[in-house]
Amino acid sequence: MKALILASLLAASAAQADPVADVARTYAAFWNTGDPALAQQALSPDFIDRTLPAGREQGVNGPLQASKGFRAAVPDLKAEATHIVPNGDLVSVRLHFTGHFTGKFGEVQGKGQAIDFQAFDLYHVVNGRIAENWHLEDNLTLLQQMGIMPGPQSAASKTQ
């Protein structure tokens, strides 16, 4: 009887495995850890960033450089994939980033400010790897938390 239950559970978990969601989890683990091997495992060699920020290199090296640069500013960066929603060869991911701005971002030195912002990504998966990515980060919140842009409270106090 135990063997039958175990076999049923294993069959159910195998049926629920989704390679599109799995590659999204691997790429989220890259953002969580900064481990370049995870990005190289998740991204196609022909990876295209469809919402490429100014100054970022196209292809696999772009996210590697972005992670390295942002981790220099926020060394304790964590990224949790709070939602992964696969649909065919596409998968939507909501990432929740947290940490403390203790390093340097451009010319700005962090003072330990808490960082807490969201990002949303849409991946196109081909042959088990992310071939294309469209992403949107809440950069306004991030820059306000870093003290690079005034927040709502500081803007309100200037008008009073």
Task: Show which residues each predicted segment covers.
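Short, low-complexity N-terminal intrinsically disordered segments enriched in polar/charged residues
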Residues: L4, L9-D46, E57, G151-Q160
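A short, structured loop/turn motif at beta-sheet edges
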Residues: I84-V91, H124-A131
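A mature extracytoplasmic/lumenal domain signature
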Residues: H83, F97-G99, D121, E137
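Low-complexity, intrinsically disordered terminal/linker segments enriched in charged
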Residues: A131-Q160
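A solvent-exposed, acidic/Ser-Thr-rich amphipathic alpha-helical stretch
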Residues: P36-L90
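A short hydrophobic beta-strand element
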Residues: D89-F101
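Exposed beta-sheet edge and beta->alpha loop/turn motif
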Residues: G99-N127
